[in-house]
Curated annotation (Swiss-Prot):
Keywords: Oxidoreductase, tRNA processing
Biased composition (Basic and acidic residues): 314-328
Protein name: tRNA uridine(34) hydroxylase
An MF annotation (GO) of this entry: oxidoreductase activity, acting on paired donors, with incorporation or reduction of molecular oxygen
GO aspect biological process, one term: tRNA modification
InterPro entries membership: Rhodanese-like_dom, Rhodanese-like_dom_sf, Rhodanese_C, TrhO, TRHO_N
Gene3D superfamilies (UniProt xref): 3.30.70.100, Rhodanese-like domain (3.40.250.10)
HAMAP family noted in UniProt: TrhO
Length: 349
């Protein structure tokens, strides 16, 4: 039986990726369709994609597949053929090509089987995920933005919205998609007779969100085909005004794609205009936050003086302090006042 997981350290894998000379293309795609045996599907795709030197992150579940990957340019067409030929439901699936790509988005292939490809918290057996809203193409999106009867809803997390969004789009304040769905229904009650336009990064969240809105009685629901990535690409190709302002946050090493020159966010430490996300350099923290170059130098890439001080301690003492400390997925949120008292950083819960 072949080894169907990685046995090489992250450090070595990253070094190998950085040493590559062939350009890579960053691609994202998703598809809601029934997978009878996600584990067997995962193993078969692992072997096919490993043979093409694909890196990235792929989730599979009974409800479908969600993938963000990078592929060597010389293997893109072979990858497309392998994917399209793997299952009838994947034949012709839309591939979102990254807009602002240095080819260094991933350095390892990780494939996991999950309960859902997007954690939605929906347990209503009458919910029909296929009853989605209508797709909008780039020109139609711009027309809707000028329609006073239309309301745009951003179905991304607060840290994504903070650095970029469509003009006048409403933010659903939440840290997870699971928490956003009921909030969106609640917030949109006063707009129930309006045209509801939902969007996200690549389409996977807003597609399910549009079905959830329809499930809750909203009839005039649209969502942007291919999300922000496809909208910006098509608008540029067609010579249309790009009405997304700022940066599109992405979940890979790039942490963002520049859509417009506007910088609408601010450094979380000094307040200077900045939209560059980073993770705190303290291994016991890794808080996701926005930091300008001046503060990066001042705090040595850390989110606080406390983290900077901890970084200067002997490694053994740092490990002792990290032991037992909750870590991972910490996100700066200006709307919360509670702090992690150990480090003096915002609590992610």
């Amino acid at each position: 039986m072949p080894v169907l997981h990685n046995r090489i350290s992250n450090e070595e894998l990253r070094a190998r990726m950085l040493a590559e000379t062939e350009p890579r293309t960053t691609i994202s795609f998703y598809k809601y369709f029934t997978i009878d045996d996600p584990k067997a599907t995962r193993d078969a795709l692992w072997q096919a994609f490993t043979a093409l030197n694909v890196f990235g992150r792929i989730y599979l579940a009974h409800e479908g597949i969600n993938a963000q990957i990078s592929v060597p340019e010389s293997n893109v067409e072979a990858f497309r053929a392998a994917l399209y030929g793997f299952h009838p439901a994947l034949d012709g699936v839309r591939l979102n090509i990254a807009l602002d790509d240095d080819g260094k988005s991933f350095w390892v292939l990780r494939m996991k089987v999950r309960d859902r490809i997007v954690a939605d918290g929906i347990d209503d057996p009458t919910f029909d995920a296929s009853d989605v809203g209508e797709y909008l193409k780039a020109a139609e999106v711009n027309a809707m933005l000028d329609d006073p009867d239309a309301v745009f809803i951003d179905m991304r997390n607060h840290y994504e919205y903070e650095v970029g969004h469509f003009e006048n789009a409403l933010e659903i304040p939440a840290d997870t998609f699971r928490a956003q769905l009921p909030k969106a229904v609640e917030m949109m009650q006063e707009y129930k007779d309006k045209k509801i336009v939902m969007y996200c990064t690549g389409g996977i969240r807003c597609e399910k969100a549009s079905a959830f809105m329809r499930h809750n009685g909203f009839q005039k629901v649209w969502h942007i085909e291919g999300g922000i990535i496809e909208y910006a690409r098509k608008a540029r190709e067609q010579g249309l005004p790009v009405r997304f302002v700022g940066k599109n946050f992405v979940f890979d090493e790039r942490m963002g794609e520049r859509i417009s020159d506007d910088v609408i966010a601010h450094c979380h430490q000094c307040g200077a205009p900045c939209d560059s996300h980073t993770n705190c350099k303290n291994d016991g923290c890794h808080l996701l936050f926005i930091q300008c170059p001046a503060c990066a130098e001042k705090f040595s890439g850390c989110c606080s003086e406390l983290c900077k001080e901890e970084m200067s301690l002997p490694e053994e003492e740092q490990r002792r302090r990290r032991a037992g400390r909750e870590n991972g997925n910490k996100i700066f949120n200006k709307s919360r006042g509670r702090l992690n008292t150990t480090l003096g950083i915002p609590d992610p819960e």
